[in-house]
A protein has these predicted regions:
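Conserved catalytic cores of phosphodiester-cleaving nucleases, focusing on short active-site segments
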Residues: 20-26
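Non-catalytic C-terminal interaction segments of nucleic acid-processing enzymes
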Residues: 1-17, 30-143
Length: 143
């Protein structure tokens, strides 16, 4: 199959004739940025994919254990790991020195579930080593 490089309205990879589009994220932190600070832009991308009849798969390069929502709820931002001032979601009144609190795993799970329900977006976590293989599997291309 020939490789064609072109701008896509949503996602990073598509196969002609398929209704699946794959958007890759190089870490959970990038995913958090997209569904947090850049939420409006990310939702527009999801809406464009749904309107065009595509199923969007967001493939996050991270530990595969995070495919389990219970494990993802325990995820802690690297920012929180370095900052003693960050509070857990249940505590109140304490803020990170930057004035805003980084996203926690519980919040991330809720946002991803909402996006899956509203727009049919699927989120999958895979190791960096297996990412290319997974892209080929989903698109039906020999690896």
């Amino acid at each position: 199959m020939p490789l064609v490089t072109m701008k896509l309205d949503f996602g990073d990879y598509q196969r002609p004739g398929s209704n699946i589009s794959i958007d890759t994220k190089n870490s959970i932190q990038e995913l958090v940025m997209d569904v947090g600070r850049d939420h409006a832009r990310f939702v527009r991308e999801c809406e464009r994919a749904a309107a065009a009849g595509y199923r969007l798969l967001v493939l996050v390069e991270s530990n595969e254990k995070y495919n389990d929502p219970a494990q993802l709820e325990r995820w802690v931002s690297d920012v929180c790991k370095r900052c003693r001032m960050c509070s857990t979601p249940r505590e109140s009144g304490r803020r990170c020195r930057r004035g805003s609190r980084p996203m926690h795993g519980q919040t991330l799970v809720k946002i991803l579930a909402t996006l899956e329900k509203k727009y049919g977006v699927r989120f999958e976590f895979t190791s960096k080593k297996n990412c290319a293989k997974r892209i080929c599997e989903v698109l039906g291309i020999e690896y």
